[in-house]
Amino acid sequence: MERRRFLELSAGAVALSVINGCTRHKPSTDTTHRTLTASDYHATRRFAETKFGRIAYVERGTADGALFLHGFPLNSFQWRGVLDPLSVHRRCVAPDFLGLGFTEVSENQSVAPNAQVEMIVALLDSLSIKSVDLIANDSGGAVAQLFVARYPQRARTLLLTNCDTERDSPPPAVHPVIELARAGKFADEFLVPSVADKALARSENGALGSLCYSKPGNPNDEAIDYYLGPLVSSPLRKSQANAYAVALAPNPLAGIEAELRRCTIPTRIVWGTADNIFSSASPDYLDRTFPHSRGVRRIVGAKLFFPEEYPELIAEEALTLWRA
């Protein structure tokens, strides 16, 4: 099924307008830290043995922990541009969720958001990390909200980018993906063709590309293979990719608002304005809901997976939040 059809089935793309106070991002000229490559990830990937399975993760730095939660159908490679810069300040840990990336789990293991939260706790325990600064995107943002609601003592700060909210989870644009996954067809009909044809993957009809990225040529071939290759590598991995999508409904954040309103964790929201998957009202909703919100920064023209395209911006926002 095509991305265009997904949007048509979900009432079409939302018309976007310039929002007062939006920030136009200018790329940094700082070249002190480089973006990690797939080879770097393969060479340094570690596995934590937990009751949930072998959790794949990449780690950089020392000191206090910072945890990076990726989107769907991505994995920790999404954060390759921020790990080195922020490793000067934090022990940066970027895991692959259950059912995604290079994490290895059994056929019967749940990959639902609640299971992801408990997996994260087990991972942190295995690494002797008591508390973390959270940075999250997309479905990783839902997991982050569940984490701070359930384990507030284990989070110091929260940086949310375009992601689910209780009022928009799963968003209408994702409903057709979920239905396709329920039929057991998402991986075969959507992911497999995108791995075989990288130009298709980058197009508006592919698994990634112009719907999720604003910069032409993104994601590159290396990223597509790293993201999607593991998900189509076996019948089990295909079924787990389907299961991840299915588990996005019913709303995993139902009833969480009251808990988030009691949250004392400093929170910052950074939102791409060209995202037509999540509601444009969501950043203000999050700002109102978290009592210790540090406000919203809007990135004009940025789409769902913009943290991957603007790592220096994410690093800047993280450092500002951590120092506040």
Task: Please provide the spans of the model-predicted regions.
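Flexible "cap/lid" subdomain of the alpha/beta-hydrolase fold that forms the substrate-access gate
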Residues: 26-45, 52-60, 89, 93, ...
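N-terminal export signals
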Residues: 5-24
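Conserved HGGG/HGGXW glycine-rich cap/lid loop of the alpha/beta-hydrolase fold
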Residues: 59-102
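Catalytic histidine-centered segment of alpha/beta-hydrolase-like enzymes
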Residues: 302-310
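Conserved acidic functional residues
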Residues: 71, 138, 308-309
